[in-house]
Structures are given as structure tokens and as C-alpha cells.
């Protein structure tokens, strides 16, 4: 970004402050051969970092977000599964620092006996939002990244809730990149 005279110190600053003309410049530049861009570094020499290493707020998640998982959850709880979920299941993850791509995670083996993980698509909200009408949702999304939702099932089962078992240090590997909202079909599938 510095080679394009954009002096954002973090991706969070870019998300909050990027102008339309800067977006156009990035779009134009990204269509070029990356090794012809001043200051470009070959991928094999780069160290990839989490796109948003220090999220400003808890990460809000949508649980049991596909049919197979809903059926699995119902079996685990010994409930009948009708194929319908009238209401979404939300939970949050406290994240002090996202884990970089390829970096190991802490096992917390002193209190955790079984780690679980699920690859998830993360939606990055680009501006303040509350009670956004469905037809305007896309306008509030900056982009998407990949996260690994790591869980300590031992802790979740013992405490009968998800927060602590999903929020231990190192339980949010993220990245390696962000796809802007316009790069994917909306809504993404």
C-alpha cells in the first residue's frame, strides 16, 4: 500500500477509512502483474499475517449454520430434527489476537482434552451497523476472510455454554487474505 501512497498502518484502518478513489486504484493495481508493482515481494519470501490481527470487538458467529450440522446437533442433544430452524443461533468469541496463517495454536492441554475446529467464512463489516434493512446489507460489508473456529469441547460441555470454550487464547486462526464484497457473488454461497 505504501508504494501506492496509502499510509494505512493496519487493515482495520484501511477498512474504516479507504476512499472510493483508493478502492479504484487498488482494483486497477490488483489486475497487474504483482511483481511489476514497486515494492512487491515474492510470496515465498513473504510472511503472511492474519488480515485483522486484533479485532476491535468480539467476533459474532452464527452457529449450526448448515443443515448437516443442525441434524448433528439435534442428534447430540437427542432432539427431533425437522429440517427447520426458525431462529438463528448466535454466539461470540473473545479474540485478543487472531492467529496468523500457518502458525500453531495453543492446545491449553492443562485444562482441555479435546480440541475441535471448523473452517468458516467470516464476514467483515465495514462500517457502523444496526438494524440494517435486508436490501442494504451488502452496503455494510467490506469483505470476507477465512477463520478457523477452534473449540474446546471439554470446556463447552462442562460449562453448558459456548463462550469460554471458544474464546481461549489462540482459538481464532484467520486468513490469509480478504476478498472484498464485490469479488464474490452476493449473497455468497
Regions found by a protein language model. Name each.
Residues 1-84, 88:
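N-terminal non-catalytic cap/leader segment that marks the start of a structured domain
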Residues 52, 56-189:
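Glycine-enriched loop-and-adjacent helix/strand subsegments that border the catalytic/binding cleft
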